[in-house]
Amino acid sequence: SRGLGDVYKRQPSQQDNLQDLIRTLRTSDAELGLAFDGDGDRLGVVTQEGEIIYPDRLLMLLSEDVLSRCPGGVVVYDIKCTRLLAPWIKNKGGQPVLSRTGHSYIKGAMQREKALIAGEMSGHLFFSERWFGFDDGLYAGARILEILSKSQDISKRLHALPQLQSTPEITLTLKEEGRNHEIIKQLQKNPNFPGAENIITLDGLRVEYKDGFGLVRASNTTPSLVLRFEGKDQDTLQRIKEVFYSALSSFVPDLDHYFSLSSPINHM
């Protein structure tokens, strides 16, 4: 098997940052593409056909492998991950633990829970099983290659990992420092999300519906709000986006611009 690697200064899990790698894969005989950020602690993965395997799905692949050796183990994942991840971990004999987004929060939860593996949507993947408990993109890539080396068809194996319709992260940049945290406090104080089955306030608001979820949280590093949406189909995705549009419209001007950028991820 052959693979291609690429290094990016920005997040290697973001669609825009992977286009060069996707083009190269389509014009070569490589079976897999790996992307790393500048300091090598984050990983992105692309199939031969150009399908991006986002980090929450990579965590499915990795946790299944780890739990086959360590049944009952804990797997930590961040608030932005797919709703399919927790039941996947349980089905494979593990214990899912939800964490706030952020390197220090994930690492802290991993240590508290004595987790075997942890990951977040930014592409940080942590291993304590057969490793030292920190995030290392090169090592995560090696673990993925180890698993995929047992498959006759790498793309088929990765494509089989379950997924729903979803958007990439949407970043709403605000002019005033601290305004993002004020908005989250107001939304948590007076949540208005019709039809919600559950509202998780661990990190912003993750509003769970029977057929999807919407998330809005304050960035830890910039004066911005970060959103992500997931649904069983396009209609569900649009419905959840519209609910969040209504909830945020009194706080953030020019929402139309941001929501026009939130086209669904291209699921192949």
Predicted regions: what is each one?
Residues 1-8:
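Short, small-residue-biased leader/transition segments that mark boundaries at the very start
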Residues 9-22, 188:
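N-terminal phosphate-binding loop and adjacent alpha-helix
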Residues 12-16, 51-54, 136:
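Alpha-helix N-cap and loop-to-helix initiation/capping positions
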